[in-house]
């Protein structure tokens, strides 16, 4: 049965800001929340599992999904394709479950256009220095790739004000608390319209 109270939450962030960790922690706290698993053409990392972290597909398979209109949103990030399956999201919402998407700002813009009632949340690092530290501590990318990720991250962060809420991920537990409050409808202190939030974010941006 369709439940009009079911909401769609969109979480976006620059690479290294910690959105994956935050969303996974939130889903543990709120098992009724449905996490939409994205399609990607990216190569699977050693710590990732098919159907758990991503749905890994070929470039041709992704092109077919996109051409058929099976994707609610799609974006090209670091030479790889990412997208959210439309049917999966629609079914969860129809079943009355809140759904959370973990995507980038490009995809978030598409979802806001397709689903104007969605709640959008942008995750920021506490500083650009901390962002660089997090990217380097992964030990998965070359210096050239890290420099590119940092450059793209700064560009991504310029879109923060397009979102309904902003969370500074300087303390994991507090950031998860903020994310949970937003899902519960009590996240006013994180609203991007709030002057204190805007001042804090502007101090982070270069």
Regions found by a protein language model. Name each.
Residues 22-23:
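Post-Walker A alpha-helix
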């Amino acid at each position: 049965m369709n439940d009009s109270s079911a909401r769609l939450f969109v979480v976006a962030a620059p690479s290294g800001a910690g959105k994956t960790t935050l969303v996974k922690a939130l889903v543990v706290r709120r098992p009724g929340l449905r996490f939409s698993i994205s399609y990607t053409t990216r190569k699977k990392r050693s710590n990732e599992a098919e159907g758990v972290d991503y749905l890994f597909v070929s470039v041709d398979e992704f092109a077919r999904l996109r051409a058929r209109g099976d994707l609610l949103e799609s974006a090209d990030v670091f030479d790889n394709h990412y997208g959210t399956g439309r049917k999966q999201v629609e079914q969860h919402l129809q079943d009355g479950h809140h759904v959370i998407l973990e995507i980038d700002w490009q995809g978030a813009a598409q979802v806001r256009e397709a689903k104007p009632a969605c709640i959008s949340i942008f995750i920021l690092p506490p500083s650009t220095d901390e962002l660089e530290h997090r990217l380097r501590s992964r030990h998965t990318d070359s210096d050239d790739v890290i420099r590119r990720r940092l450059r793209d991250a700064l560009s991504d962060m310029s879109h923060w004000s397009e979102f309904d809420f902003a969370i500074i991920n300087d303390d994991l537990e507090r950031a998860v608390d903020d994310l949970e409050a937003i899902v519960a409808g009590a996240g006013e202190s994180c609203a991007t319209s709030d002057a204190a939030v805007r001042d804090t974010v502007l101090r982070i941006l270069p």
